[in-house]
């Protein structure tokens, strides 16, 4: 776990040096259509049955992520595999003014990856069926690690 946090921290630090897409830079039509589709869905999740730690992480997610876009975007996205969320969060952290620290990024990741393993099970299973054996094992290990950490 410490190794994962250290690697995530290094990746975040390295990625922050990259130049983020300018806010006014146009988005291609396909990406714009995907975003619009995701934003049409619900903007909240019933987390009442989630573990307390995940509920706390949801609060960080909802506070930080709603500053720049609708929560319906990540909630209804087709991201489900932990690696998808890792890339997404790193990209959001690079955005100027995001205010997402490495610690917040980890909490947001934990929430989104955990939530996907519960609420997006069908999408997750479909993606894992198409993954390489190594990718599938890495995703399953990360999901197990999250459930071991939070399901008490």
Give residue spans per PLM region.
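Bacterial N-terminal signal peptides
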Residues: 7-16
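Positively charged n-region of N-terminal signal peptides that target proteins for export
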Residues: 1-5
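Sec/Tat signal peptide C-region and signal peptidase I cleavage site
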Residues: 16-22
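C-type cytochrome heme c attachment motif
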Residues: 59-71, 84-90, 94-95, 106-110
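Short cysteine/histidine-rich zinc-coordinating motifs and their immediately flanking basic loops
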Residues: 77-82
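Detector for the c-type heme attachment site
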Residues: 68-74, 101, 113
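Flexible coil segments in periplasmic/lumen-exposed cytochrome c-class electron-transfer proteins
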Residues: 24-54, 62, 102-152
């Amino acid at each position: 776990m410490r190794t994962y946090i250290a690697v995530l921290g290094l990746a975040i630090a390295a990625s922050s040096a990259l130049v983020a897409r300018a806010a006014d830079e146009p988005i291609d039509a396909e990406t714009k259509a995907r975003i619009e589709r995701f934003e049409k869905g619900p903007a909240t999740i019933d987390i009442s049955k989630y573990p307390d730690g995940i509920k706390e992480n949801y609060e960080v997610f909802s506070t930080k992520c709603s500053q720049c876009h609708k929560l319906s975007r990540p909630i209804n996205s087709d991201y489900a595999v932990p690696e998808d969320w890792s890339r997404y969060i790193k990209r959001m952290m690079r955005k100027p003014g995001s205010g997402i620290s490495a610690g917040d990024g980890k909490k947001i990741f934990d929430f989104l990856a955990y939530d996907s393993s519960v609420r997006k099970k069908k999408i997750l299973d479909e993606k894992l069926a198409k993954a390489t054996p190594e990718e599938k094992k890495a995703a399953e290990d990360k999901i197990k690690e999250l459930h071991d950490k939070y399901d008490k």
